[in-house]
Amino acid sequence: MSTIEEQLKALREETLASLKQITAGNEKEMQDLRVSVLGKKGSLTEILKGMKDVSAEMRPIIGKHVNEARDVLTAAFEETAKLLEEKKVAAQLASESIDVTLPGRPVATGHRHVLTQTSEEIEDIFIGMGYQVVDGFEVEQDYYNFERMNLPKDHPARDMQDTFYITEEILLRTHTSPVQARAMDAHDFSKGPLKMISPGRVFRRDTDDATHSHQFHQIEGLVVGKNISMADLQGTLQLIVQKMFGEERQIRLRPSYFPFTEPSVEVDVSCFKCGGEGCNVCKKTGWIEIMGAGMVHPRVLEMSGIDATVYSGFAFGLGQERVAMLRYGINDIRGFYQGDVRFSEQFK
């Protein structure tokens, strides 16, 4: 065995033994060892200087041993570097591990606004009664908002609703009734009656105070079919009120006037605070006004191409804010819109 071969064997054994001694976190020690063995001025280079003394016949053999030693040592350094990196990552993960036995921190969650809750509850009542929920436009044509509701341009009842006009013919809707007009236009009555509600935001030129707002929410209902009577309306209203305010509640109908219904009524509900005895909530009357209603005016039906001698219907409308204020004892409508978290958190 030549001297060079002995040197190569010794270098391999010493280097591999040194690599096994290097621990995680000592990457610099490994790098220094690599330079001292495989670098330009390293041990392997020094051994190669002895090739000049090797005979021509032995040089290919010794050269092969040198290349094998270089390959083995290079692979050993790469494998050691990989193992050190894996140990480093494992140690880092262990130091950053989460103790799942520690108590968690509660996450603050939001909740639906009280008006959204009220609207969804009312919609669920009607869906359970077979009504469909129909949405419509907030920016509406004067024709659908007024004329289709039996309110021509010169009708004095238009003064009852101060309106936000965008142009002479375009406005912010003052009620959700235009949705009903379009629904009557589109409905195929040969397939059965129309039963729908139209919830949404409406706008009127009111001065904002504790009981008025320039924008508020309405849910209007409409049923049109054959042989629809005032008794059907009264039974429907009684059922709605009991589902919203309790089974013990009763209703009272008072004559009123709306251009799009005839006859028209105001609907009162027996006071849920005093049971009809008289208190500050019902202003000592025992009754609380809750909504308006009536039988659909024949002229409104005819404008949708519906034969008023064959078909009839009833309509009603109530405000979500009004319902929420009564149910939760809220005395200022502005609380719904001011974004005060202290107000909203009461209705989680």
Swiss-Prot record:
Q: Which InterPro entries match?
A: aa-tRNA-synth_II, aa-tRNA-synth_II/BPL/LPL, Phe-tRNA-synth_IIc_asu, Phe-tRNA_ligase_II_N, Phe_tRNA_ligase_alpha1_bac, Phenylalanyl-tRNA_Synthase, tRNA-bd_arm
List required co-factors.
Answer: Mg(2+)
Kindly list the cysteine pairs connected by disulfide bridges. Answer: none
Subcellular localization, per the record?
A: Cytoplasm
| Catalytic reactions on record | tRNA(Phe) + L-phenylalanine + ATP = L-phenylalanyl-tRNA(Phe) + AMP + diphosphate + H(+)
One GO cellular component term: cytoplasm
Q: Give the keywords, sorted.
A: Aminoacyl-tRNA synthetase, ATP-binding, Cytoplasm, Ligase, Magnesium, Metal-binding, Nucleotide-binding, Protein biosynthesis
Please state the Enzyme Commission number of this protein: 6.1.1.20
Q: Residues that bind Mg(2+), according to the entry?
A: E262
One of the protein's GO biological processes: phenylalanyl-tRNA aminoacylation
Organism domain of life: Bacteria
Aminoacyl-tRNA synthetase is among the record's keywords: yes
Cited Gene3D superfamilies: Bira Bifunctional Protein, Domain 2
User: Could you list the residue ranges that cross the membrane?
Assistant: none
The UniProt similarity line reads: Belongs to the class-II aminoacyl-tRNA synthetase family. Phe-tRNA synthetase alpha subunit type 1 subfamily.
Protein name (database record)? Phenylalanine--tRNA ligase alpha subunit
